[in-house]
A protein has these predicted regions:
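Long, continuous compositionally biased terminal/linker segments
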Residues: 41-82
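A structural feature recognizing the 12-helix transmembrane core of secondary solute carriers
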Residues: 9, 31-32, 40, 63-67, ...
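N-terminal beta-strand motif that seeds the catalytic metal site of vicinal oxygen chelate
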Residues: 1-16, 70, 124
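Charge-dense, helix-prone N-terminal extensions
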Residues: 13, 21, 25, 62, ...
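Core segments of cupin and vicinal oxygen chelate
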Residues: 7-49
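Short glycine-enriched loop/turn motifs at secondary-structure junctions
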Residues: 1, 63-66, 102
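Short amphipathic alpha-helical coupling segments at ligand-binding clamshell hinges
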Residues: 18, 82-83
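Vicinal oxygen chelate
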Residues: 84-124
């Protein structure tokens, strides 16, 4: 359905350090560096960039979208817990601790360093 997702940031290096660590349990890594954006892809498909961290093209401040959330898919509850724990340790804000929601599915919610809402879940 989607070609890729962009997340606006006001501090590309700080945001990259955050996402490089929090995405590690998902086997997603930074594969492209540019002065205005960084690209991330799964380790097994490094040429298929699916996530970009970007300084806004219009050179205005990056702001969060009200009602916008990006959700990552995990292969286990352990990865959900690890993602959440890493995020909190790096300064993310809690938006919902790991646990079952919407039936048995397992979710965790955070706000990244720029205030963007991110989620991780394991379909049960």
């Amino acid at each position: 359905m989607f070609a890729f997702i962009t997340i606006g940031t006001n501090n590309l290096k700080k945001s990259s350090a955050f996402y490089s660590k929090i995405l590690k349990p998902l086997k997603i890594k930074k594969v492209l560096s540019h002065n205005r954006y960084y690209g991330y892809a799964k380790k097994e498909t490094p040429k298929k960039i699916e996530l970009y961290l970007i300084i806004p093209h219009n050179k205005k401040k990056a702001t969060i979208g009200n009602g916008t959330m990006i959700t990552f898919k995990a292969n286990s509850k352990k990865i959900v817990n690890e993602f959440y724990k890493i995020g909190i340790s790096l300064g993310a804000k809690d938006e919902g601790m790991p646990g079952p929601r919407h039936g048995k599915d397992y979710y965790a919610y955070l706000r990244d360093l720029d205030g963007n809402k991110i989620c991780i879940f394991k379909k049960i």
